[in-house]
């Protein structure tokens, strides 16, 4: 039990330490702002030992708290990355360079090509699809002349991998509500 108490005292910095090196050497290892305050305030080695012990006990209290991430400090002004979706309705092929730039900036792009000439729209889709492939992105047709292009950080998935096919029934003419003419004539002739 005594060994544990000695360890506790040593850990908290209360046990007698070997003679401190000359004050000039110790002060020179401190950051400039702290060095000036310590010398001006007239702190001796006892004050430094006390503050070290205080820091050690704070560290022990934090680590004994049980949460591993309790000592993580967020950087002020740094926000977590957010995803951005850009909706474009280009009118010419010249705007495709901007689409590629958005993808390089890891932004998702939805392109509505209904305003473009069909031949130029096909050329535009081919161009952006090539750029998307080059950056390991993904592409998906989501409607008539509407396409989704995503960077490699975004995965595109559909609820089911099978394409839903409409039910195909053989074409039948509906059953008439009135009797056919032939049957009607037979029934009238028998009366």
From Swiss-Prot:
Keyword Cell inner membrane: no
Compartments it resides in: Cytoplasm
Region annotation (Disordered) ranges: 1-77
Sorted UniProt keywords: Cell cycle, Cell division, Cytoplasm, Septation
Any one GO cellular component localisation term in the record: cytoplasm
InterPro entries referenced in this protein's UniProt entry, alphabetically: Cell_div_SepF, Cell_div_SepF/SepF-rel, SepF-like_sf
Pfam families for this protein: SepF
GO biological process, one term: division septum assembly
Oligomer status and interactors: Homodimer. Interacts with FtsZ.
Annotated function: Cell division protein that is part of the divisome complex and is recruited early to the Z-ring. Probably stimulates Z-ring formation, perhaps through the cross-linking of FtsZ protofilaments. Its function overlaps with FtsA.
PANTHER family, alphabetized: CELL DIVISION PROTEIN SEPF
Record-stated family: Belongs to the SepF family.
Descriptive protein name: Cell division protein SepF
Annotated organism of origin: Synechococcus sp. (strain JA-2-3B'a(2-13)) (Cyanobacteria bacterium Yellowstone B-Prime)
């Amino acid at each position: 039990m005594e060994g544990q108490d000695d360890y506790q005292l040593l850990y908290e910095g209360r046990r007698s330490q070997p003679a401190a090196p000359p004050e000039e050497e110790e002060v020179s290892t401190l950051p400039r702002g702290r060095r000036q305050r310590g010398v001006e305030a007239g702190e001796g080695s006892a004050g430094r030992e006390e503050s070290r012990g205080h820091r050690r006990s704070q560290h022990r209290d934090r680590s004994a708290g049980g949460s591993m991430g309790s000592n993580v400090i967020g950087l002020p002004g740094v926000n977590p990355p957010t995803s951005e979706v850009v909706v474009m309705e280009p009118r010419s092929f010249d705007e495709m360079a901007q689409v590629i730039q958005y993808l390089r900036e890891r932004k998702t792009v939805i392109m509505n090509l209904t305003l473009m000439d069909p031949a130029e729209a096909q050329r535009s889709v081919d161009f952006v699809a090539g750029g998307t492939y080059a950056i390991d992105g993904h592409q998906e047709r989501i409607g008539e002349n509407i396409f989704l292009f995503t960077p490699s950080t975004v995965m595109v998935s559909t609820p089911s991998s099978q394409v839903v096919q409409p039910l195909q029934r053989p074409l039948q003419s509906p059953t008439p509500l009135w009797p056919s003419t032939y049957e009607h004539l037979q029934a009238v002739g028998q009366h």
